[in-house]
Amino acid sequence: SYMLDAQMLNGYDRIVSDEPFFSFIITYSGHGPYTEEQDTISAPHLARARAVIDYSTVPYTTEAQKEEYTRAVAQAMETDAFIGGEWLEADGHAEDTVLMLFTDHYCKYFSDAEFISAIKGETDRNMLSNVPFVIWTEGIAPQVYDKYVSTMDIAPTIVDLFSLDADLRYYIG
């Protein structure tokens, strides 16, 4: 078991090969609660997160909100460090790699739902569930699609993008 996304990189050389491969990684670092309970994850990044928060325009109204938000940012920094991709460039895999990143839910672990609504500028709880899905590969210009999709769309998207041989009757999405 692991707590830090960075620990997964310790096994990178066992995952990567010169042959095409697929790896599915679920990270834990961004999950709440955003309290001292998750210090293993947030502590390495707290000082930097505090510096960022001090210059932000996030509309917190209490020190407790500020601390919880700061810890969430620190935990996100752990995942950012893992996703950074320097390791792909260092071993020459960046040009033949596709990264797909998605979250399964919004930051529902915050103790104050109204605070999250204020940050996102959205009060409809259903709309708060809109989460990003990112597909990255070297040399492709960034694009934004604002269509509503679901996690059930990911597998058919992968099949289509890579022209995989698949019986689409068994896929929904």
Which residues fall in each region the model found?
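Solvent-exposed soluble domains appended to multi-pass membrane proteins
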Residues: 1-173
